[in-house]
Amino acid sequence: MTAAPLMPDSTHPCRRRKSYTFFWCSLGVYAEALLFLLSHLSDACELPRPFEAMELKGTPKLFYAVGEKIEYKCKKGYLYLSPYLMIATCEPNHTWVPISDAGCIKVQCTMLQDPSFGKVYYIDGSFSWGARAKFTCMEGYYVVGMSVLHCVLKGDDEAYWNGYPPHCEKIYCLPPPKIKNGTHTLTDINVFKYHEAVSYSCDPTPGPDKFSLVGTSMIFCAGHNTWSNSPPECKVVKCPNPVLQNGRLISGAGEIFSYQSTVMFECLQGFYMEGSSMVICSANNSWEPSIPKCLKGPRPTHPTKPPVYNYTGYPSPREGIFSQELDAWIIALIVITSIVGVFILCLIVLRCFEHRKKTNVSAAR
């Protein structure tokens, strides 16, 4: 009995490009190469993460061998602080020792002093470059100058404030504005202190219609040359006689209705009111809100409005639930696809190994 001849190299399953076996074997070879590469790279260190205060000297690499060293330098705007090391070594556990940018400190501006009758606050908690300093004054004083200074970088290792520190001065106000047909108290004072107040009043009128004071009657010095409110006006305000058809006045009746006169209404029996039952005479000679209406019949009940999602532009709750369910299905599909992909890759490698084993056994026979 003669031994079976060995399969020619050109007809080997892994050599026939048109066969499915060649496809499986090729994928297996790629998987082995990937495992080989990962096993060799597992003993290397990756490039360390970027640091805020220091940067790598020279050209960086993707991987470094165990025992290999890298050297750092402080970035622009940072100063080296001895005795911190600027060299790190790749350790067998894939870490760099030591690795810290504590040896590089940020360049600082000079520390600012509190002004008289004021304080300085460092908004960012420091006075290094990029920081801000805010100046405030005690009550009754105001800041003269820039209230906020910025620490800016000059060159590589210097920093300075972008302006001169301000100072605090007492708050004073010039006399308040004069008004037509009226006056204010303390007209003989030329300079008013902080929180000093004046009151306005209207002049008497020669006719039957009196002037009304429209606005705030008292204002005070609230800031440097700043009064707490605008001055009021003195003018004649008359609103028309309030008439409510199918209704009547129950409060505030009179012959003249001047500024801020208030009246109240009610409807006759068999009518209901649409609008506000109380109105006030405003500065523009009209009633606010508008005089109501008395409509015949019983007061209607408020109809129940449809849910907000029934209006155009609002999604319904069903659409929201469907969207959430759809997102969950997409996530589940991605997870299942990933698991199946890993399983297929493992199966490819296993089948390729089994095929090689069978081929070797056949060749040995």
Swiss-Prot record:
<feature type="glycosylation site" description="N-linked (GlcNAc...) asparagine">
    <location>
        <position position="181"/>
    </location>
</feature>
<dbReference type="GO" id="GO:0009986">
    <property type="term" value="C:cell surface"/>
</dbReference>
<feature type="disulfide bond">
    <location>
        <begin position="109"/>
        <end position="151"/>
    </location>
</feature>
<feature type="disulfide bond">
    <location>
        <begin position="137"/>
        <end position="168"/>
    </location>
</feature>
<keyword id="KW-0768">Sushi</keyword>
<keyword id="KW-0472">Membrane</keyword>
<feature type="domain" description="Sushi 3">
    <location>
        <begin position="171"/>
        <end position="236"/>
    </location>
</feature>
<keyword id="KW-0325">Glycoprotein</keyword>
<dbReference type="InterPro" id="IPR035976">
    <property type="entry name" value="Sushi/SCR/CCP_sf"/>
</dbReference>
<feature type="glycosylation site" description="O-linked (GalNAc...) threonine">
    <location>
        <position position="205"/>
    </location>
</feature>
<keyword id="KW-0964">Secreted</keyword>
<keyword id="KW-1133">Transmembrane helix</keyword>
<feature type="domain" description="Sushi 1">
    <location>
        <begin position="45"/>
        <end position="106"/>
    </location>
</feature>
<dbReference type="InterPro" id="IPR000436">
    <property type="entry name" value="Sushi_SCR_CCP_dom"/>
</dbReference>
<feature type="disulfide bond">
    <location>
        <begin position="202"/>
        <end position="234"/>
    </location>
</feature>
<feature type="domain" description="Sushi 4">
    <location>
        <begin position="237"/>
        <end position="296"/>
    </location>
</feature>
<comment type="function">
    <text>May be involved in the fusion of the spermatozoa with the oocyte during fertilization.</text>
</comment>
<feature type="topological domain" description="Extracellular">
    <location>
        <begin position="45"/>
        <end position="329"/>
    </location>
</feature>
<feature type="disulfide bond">
    <location>
        <begin position="173"/>
        <end position="221"/>
    </location>
</feature>
<dbReference type="Pfam" id="PF00084">
    <property type="entry name" value="Sushi"/>
</dbReference>
<feature type="disulfide bond">
    <location>
        <begin position="239"/>
        <end position="281"/>
    </location>
</feature>
<dbReference type="GO" id="GO:0002079">
    <property type="term" value="C:inner acrosomal membrane"/>
</dbReference>
<keyword id="KW-0278">Fertilization</keyword>
<feature type="glycosylation site" description="N-linked (GlcNAc...) asparagine">
    <location>
        <position position="310"/>
    </location>
</feature>
<feature type="transmembrane region" description="Helical">
    <location>
        <begin position="330"/>
        <end position="350"/>
    </location>
</feature>
<protein>
    <recommendedName>
        <fullName>Membrane cofactor protein</fullName>
    </recommendedName>
</protein>
<dbReference type="InterPro" id="IPR050350">
    <property type="entry name" value="Compl-Cell_Adhes-Reg"/>
</dbReference>
<dbReference type="GO" id="GO:0005576">
    <property type="term" value="C:extracellular region"/>
</dbReference>
<dbReference type="GO" id="GO:0007338">
    <property type="term" value="P:single fertilization"/>
</dbReference>
<feature type="disulfide bond">
    <location>
        <begin position="267"/>
        <end position="294"/>
    </location>
</feature>
<feature type="domain" description="Sushi 2">
    <location>
        <begin position="107"/>
        <end position="170"/>
    </location>
</feature>
<feature type="glycosylation site" description="O-linked (GalNAc...) threonine">
    <location>
        <position position="312"/>
    </location>
</feature>
<keyword id="KW-0812">Transmembrane</keyword>
<keyword id="KW-0968">Cytoplasmic vesicle</keyword>
<feature type="topological domain" description="Cytoplasmic">
    <location>
        <begin position="351"/>
        <end position="365"/>
    </location>
</feature>
<keyword id="KW-1015">Disulfide bond</keyword>
<dbReference type="InterPro" id="IPR017341">
    <property type="entry name" value="CD46"/>
</dbReference>
<feature type="signal peptide">
    <location>
        <begin position="1"/>
        <end position="44"/>
    </location>
</feature>
<keyword id="KW-0677">Repeat</keyword>
<feature type="glycosylation site" description="O-linked (GalNAc...) threonine">
    <location>
        <position position="301"/>
    </location>
</feature>
<feature type="glycosylation site" description="O-linked (GalNAc...) threonine">
    <location>
        <position position="304"/>
    </location>
</feature>
<comment type="subunit">
    <text>Interacts with C3b. Interacts with C4b. Interacts with moesin/MSN.</text>
</comment>
